[in-house]
Amino acid sequence: LMMLLPLAASAQGGGESVSKHFNMFVKHHTKILIDAAESMPADKYGYKPTAAQWTFGKIIAHMAGDNRITCSAIAGVAPDKSPEPSATASKEELVSALKGSLTFCEQAVAKVNDGMLAGSVTYYGQRATRVSPLIGLVEDWSDHYSQLAGYLRLNNVLPPTAKNGEM
């Protein structure tokens, strides 16, 4: 919710564009998500705090797959039909898949301007405004970064946003 406040403020005529704030969010989260994925030791990609939770690798695999769907909607193109990476793939394969999906998202969001936000796109098989997958992206990345940061801490690894007072 805190991530959406600048968006609401700019929509009230603050002078800055809403799409600029989405771009800032995507650039920042691309960096911290990649840093988080790279920070976890390869032998801990199978780690999960409880039996009911996903492994660290599953979260990375899920994000790589889900980003293709969400960012295809943002771009207004059909999603890539390739399957989500395996949760048991190597760290290198998972980080590579995540990086590729994040690059695709950066490119998709960079093409969006404020005039496009109310435009119609297909998002998970439904018609929606383009702002719907953008908000979904903010929500999803914030949720999963929080998971990754918790998993890192449980393995004595400092999360990227805890280093140098970064937020």
Range-by-range predicted roles:
Residues 1-8:
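Bacterial N-terminal signal peptides
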Residues 11-12:
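Boundary of Sec targeting at the N-terminus
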Residues 15-16:
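N-terminal pre-domain segments of enzymes
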Residues 23-34, 44-83, 122-167:
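Short, contiguous alpha-helical
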Residues 36, 88-122, 128-144:
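Acidic/histidine-rich alpha-helical segments that form the ligand environment
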Residues 39, 62-65, 100:
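Residues within well-ordered alpha-helical secondary structure of globular protein domains
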Residues 41-45, 75, 110, 114-117:
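Short, flexible helix-adjacent loops and helix caps
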